[in-house]
């Protein structure tokens, strides 16, 4: 009988440990968010991040306008605080990085002095760090 109780406790403990491990692994998966909205992208982390986890993020914006005669600028803000700008060319790849958590808001904006967008694509990658 003691052997059977010991066996049951071992299985219960193993099951509990596996559940905890699965939760930890699930919380370590990177999250990819893509947007093809032209000229702007609003990323509300309430929609996709997990509470209680801090994330490192990278936002990459690829943008082209229709002619070399024009210029553009891309900006990224976290909770209305500007994190950086990139611009003065008709073709750009802009990269912004930082840390955030659920509830934070990322806002990508652009300015162009003419032409039309031939490409505007945003990819954000959120990597759990704690």
Which ranges hold each PLM region?
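Long, low-complexity or tandemly repetitive, helically biased scaffold regions used
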Residues: 1-9
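Extracellular jelly-roll beta-sandwich "head" domains, especially the C-terminal globular C1q domain
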Residues: 12, 16-18, 22-130
